[in-house]
Amino acid sequence: RVPELVFLNLDEAFGRTEGDEEIQDLLQGSRGLNLGLHFLSGALTFDPAVTKVGAELASRIVWLDAFLTNVDRTFRNTNMLMWHKELWLIDHGASLYFHYSWVNWQKHAVSPFVQVKDHVLLPEASGLEEADAEMKRLLTEEKIREIVALIPDDWLHWSESPGRPQEIREIYIRFLCERLAHSETFIKEAQDARKALI
């Protein structure tokens, strides 16, 4: 599960009274349209020593993070919450890290994603091949195109931009479709890393 996604506008006054300069810089850089997650009041940080996750769910989450190249769901920082006895995924900001350097995005699309070895749920993820089959059934090129089309143009204008918004969207689509078509590469990497753990 992922908390409800919402679009929100932050005006210039937001965060002016924040004492931490680094956070204030982040808030000032976030003026305008943002993507946020519904606040899960009373949620607790997921602790793998306290809460066990079944193999099917763990495998799906590991698959998703390997697909999106999310480097930030580790034992040190799980980026998961327990809320009403359910597991919720938060903070996907470290995903798709190829977009910090557009050079060789094609190479990144077919990479094995070696960072999966640090995934907090990897020890429980014994059903990766089944998760792969299920996710490929659900996540088609058409669905990827629908999702990427939702990205506002304003979010696709930056100084290091490789092109106009539609060109950038097309790179994201091609990246995700290539990743999906070559999922056996990151599945094998995850399986090998899991064998080394157990």
Question: What are the residue ranges of the model-derived segments?
Answer:
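Phosphate/dinucleotide-binding and metal-coordinating scaffold of catalytic cores
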Residues: 1-198
